């Protein structure tokens, strides 16, 4: 689950971290009122969407008049913002953040993720603030400094100081950075975060550090104990198909291809997508129906896949371990008949009662192709959408 910038900064405030004075707004008049409350003669107004690249897309602007605030609000509220991180439709802008301006002398980067290899929260810091950290990692990886947090003892002040030295900070900046580092580490653990990013973390002309931006992702598996955060989730930013899938405990991620994929098991699903690519096709989605591939779940999976107008064929790849393939075949047939599938459906079954499952599919009389192997299934799917 992702948070908006204004929500992330509210958490920063709660943990004692320095952020600009800012107010979230729903209307143009609220934006003007917010500027009056903040004071000053210049403000930054930002579209609130779950995507990066807002500045380059026109979703962040420095304004010096109240009319400028109104104009920006009227331009974006109720519209969709398209950035390099969104699809062609973009994401809806329902809120704006009006903030005071900061006198920036230098921009830094500070973020944290869970490193699966070391099984520890890892902080990353760089002098290259204000740009995509992925680009820095690719072009100048030596400019990224890391600190791994031992889960037994937690983040230590010396780790913050060490990062501060590597960033070239001095004087009171070192103490400020260490406080931010320790606060973020506590926030990361207590709120079950999976990603945290401040880009940029700025040094002002007065030698103060301020969290100028904030990005937070929360582990969706921890929502049962993060109910307050779950309550502020902005579902308008989520893909409708992904929300539908979550209701049925299906793991679905929309992509931009033409071959819908339905698979049981995340690893098998990724392998299926790879082999579709290998044979010249493009998957329209990642969909893992899990171990309980019942008729009801398969039916909902078909509905989700076919709600994408780009889907020209559906590839079903099921390994029958706990679940028998003949029952899966019955479920696929029932789902195809109920949903009224009009595109070709290619089914590859392997494992428990696979031969019986393929026989049931072949005798169904529906537009279902029983593939002999995964390679055959991928070739049939690519052929069905007009590929070679």
Swiss-Prot record:
Q: What is this protein called?
A: Succinate--CoA ligase [ADP-forming] subunit beta
Subunit info?
A: Heterotetramer of two alpha and two beta subunits.
Q: Which annotated residues bind substrate?
A: 264, 321-323
Q: Please list the reactions this protein catalyses.
A: succinate + ATP + CoA = succinyl-CoA + ADP + phosphate; GTP + succinate + CoA = succinyl-CoA + GDP + phosphate
Coiled-coil annotation reads none
Q: Which cofactor does it need?
A: Mg(2+)
Q: Where does ATP bind?
A: 46, 53-55, 99, 102, 107
Query: Which Pfam families does this UniProt record tie to the protein?
Result: ATP-grasp_2, Ligase_CoA
EC supergroup of this enzyme:
ligase
What is the species of this protein? Psychromonas ingrahamii (strain DSM 17664 / CCUG 51855 / 37)
Say yes or no: keyword Transmembrane present: no
Functionally, this protein is described as follows: Succinyl-CoA synthetase functions in the citric acid cycle (TCA), coupling the hydrolysis of succinyl-CoA to the synthesis of either ATP or GTP and thus represents the only step of substrate-level phosphorylation in the TCA. The beta subunit provides nucleotide specificity of the enzyme and binds the substrate succinate, while the binding sites for coenzyme A and phosphate are found in the alpha subunit.
Highest taxon of the lineage: Bacteria
| A GO MF label | magnesium ion binding
GO biological process, any: tricarboxylic acid cycle
Q: How is the cofactor bound?
A: Binds 1 Mg(2+) ion per subunit.
- Designated gene of the protein: sucC
Domain ATP-grasp as annotated: residue spans: 9-244
Its EC number is 6.2.1.5
Pathways involved: Carbohydrate metabolism; tricarboxylic acid cycle; succinate from succinyl-CoA (ligase route): step 1/1
Q: Which PROSITE patterns does the record associate with it?
A: ATP_GRASP, SUCCINYL_COA_LIG_3
User: Which GO terms of the cellular component aspect does the record hold?
Assistant: cytosol; succinate-CoA ligase complex
Disulfide pattern? none
